[in-house]
Amino acid sequence: MNRTLVMTAAACLVATAASAQTPAPDAAPPFVLATYYRCDYSKQTRADTLYKQVIAPLLDKQIKAGHLTAYGFSSHRMGGVFRRLESWTAPTLAHLIAAQDAYEAELAKVNPKAGAEFDAICGSHDDYIWNRTLGSPTNAAAPTPAYSYSRYMGCNLSKEGEADMIMETAFAPIMNKHLAAGHITAWGYFI
């Protein structure tokens, strides 16, 4: 199983186009669907336009329906083969699945051509579902950041509990010091 540490300038999974609502303070850790796209480099800006004009409004509907609490679409900066990252955040796995089902049905109804065009540009992807288990409080009022950073760690399955404990006792205090100093505005640890 992989663990991931996400440090951002303003939100836990940050994107160039993001929307969020503040979860209740006692809410369970959120689930995040992350889709990592391989896109045609020469057409990726068209994919960005399609996302902003067609996909984002449909995801806004999923926030209004209470299925999602946030979503984002990030561009590639360095490393790896993925050109774009889409993230959806939901309070439960059931909400995440409901959002996906409703979104896909709505896109097929209102603009299937745009969906097909986006898929042709970003035709290959990997999907992951993460559960945020540790991190700073979210700040839905924070402005969309210009940059975020993520680190993926492959853990020995028999020692994941130890890795989680090290993250909580060694890394979390360091991240919280950076948060308090204003170097970052949020961070999260997902499993």
Language-model features and meaning:
Residues 7-16:
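Bacterial N-terminal signal peptides
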Residues 20-191:
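Short S/T/G/P-rich N-terminal loop/turn motif that feeds into the first structured element of a domain
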